């Protein structure tokens, strides 16, 4: 199932889905909170894995989900896998360099052992596109809220501190 959480203004009519696999849940703009909204979405799911993706994410092909799920087969401790974010072709040089630095072209596995070398960057996790092992997510209490940004990084810190990996 796909759960679409749509932020709406007062009086705005929520979108409707004609696909039985897609359920739309409107959230009043005044009630929106990054951590709480994602926690709400996760609570709707009965799946083994939950994926969070922002409305402006543009997958480069139709293999995004299956490629992300492969990350969970690398090591049994993996609890979060996030997607690589590329700069748009028309982006300025700062945007391009930021994406290259934050999202290198090689995957990595981050654990508590990386804290000495990477510091806080050990906890980096994209808030644009990430998949969570639902069992671990639930065991760790899910997203913290209220949270206005970095909800995925906060969750990644909980995952790594509990001896899981990202």
Protein language model features and the residues they cover:
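Short, flexible, basic/aromatic active-site loop/helix in glycosyltransferases
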Residues: 83, 101-122
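Acidic donor-binding loop at a coil-to-helix junction in glycosyltransferase catalytic cores
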Residues: 149-155
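The conserved acidic donor/metal-binding loop of glycosyltransferases
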Residues: 54-58
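Glycine-rich, basic loop-to-helix element that forms the pyrophosphate-binding segment
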Residues: 28-45
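Conserved donor NDP-sugar-binding/catalytic core segment of glycosyltransferases
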Residues: 62-96
């Amino acid at each position: 199932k796909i759960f679409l959480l749509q932020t709406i203004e007062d009086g705005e009519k929520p979108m409707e889905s004609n696909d039985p696999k897609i359920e739309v849940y409107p959230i009043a703009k005044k009630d929106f909170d990054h951590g709480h909204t994602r926690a709400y979405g996760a609570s709707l799911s009965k799946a083994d894995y939950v994926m969070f993706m922002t409305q402006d994410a543009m997958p480069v092909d139709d293999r995004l989900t299956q490629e992300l799920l492969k990350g969970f087969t690398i090591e049994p401790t993996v609890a979060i896998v996030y997607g690589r974010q590329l700069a748009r072709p028309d982006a300025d040089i700062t945007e391009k360099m930021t994406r290259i630095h934050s999202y290198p072209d090689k995957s990595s596995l981050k654990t508590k052992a990386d804290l000495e070398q990477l510091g806080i960057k050990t906890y980096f996790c994209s808030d644009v596109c990430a998949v969570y092992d639902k069992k671990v997510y639930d065991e760790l209490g899910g997203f913290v809220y209220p949270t206005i940004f970095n909800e995925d990084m906060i969750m990644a810190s909980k995952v790594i501190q509990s001896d899981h990996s990202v």
